[in-house]
């Protein structure tokens, strides 16, 4: 039940706050900035954490082996992997590859 409650709250947040989310960068281009972690979940299949984060009102998605608490801000450098839609709600989301995270 707690997972469903968490997912429902996240869906509502994405629907309201990130409705106007835009893609950042072109595919294959390097990007950098400061992101705030919005959601995370651990995939036991890949043994990695999947993160959804906010960059100036736009959603990004990436994988990382380190656990980062939700709400924490991180500086990042990465390459744009793909442009797509969020899995919970149809808003624009940029998938990143080769992500390096730094302290803010």
Predicted regions span which residues?
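Structural detector for short beta-strands of small beta-barrel domains
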Residues: 2, 8-47, 74-80
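Small/flexible residues
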Residues: 5, 38, 50, 63, ...
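Beta-strand/loop nucleic-acid-binding surfaces
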Residues: 47-72, 84
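OB-fold/S1-family single-stranded nucleic acid-binding modules
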Residues: 50-56, 79-104
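Compositionally biased amphipathic helical and low-complexity segments enriched in hydrophobic
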Residues: 11, 23, 60-61, 97, ...
């Amino acid at each position: 039940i707690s997972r469903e409650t968490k997912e429902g709250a996240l869906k509502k947040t994405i629907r309201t706050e990130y409705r106007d989310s835009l893609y950042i960068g072109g595919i294959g281009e390097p990007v950098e900035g400061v992101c705030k972690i919005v959601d995370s979940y651990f995939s036991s299949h890949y043994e990695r954490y999947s993160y959804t984060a906010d960059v100036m009102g736009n959603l990004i998605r990436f994988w990382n082996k380190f656990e980062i608490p939700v709400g924490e801000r991180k500086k990042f450098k990465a390459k744009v992997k793909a442009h797509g839609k969020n899995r919970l709600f149809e808003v624009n989301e940029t998938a990143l590859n080769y992500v390096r995270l730094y302290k803010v």
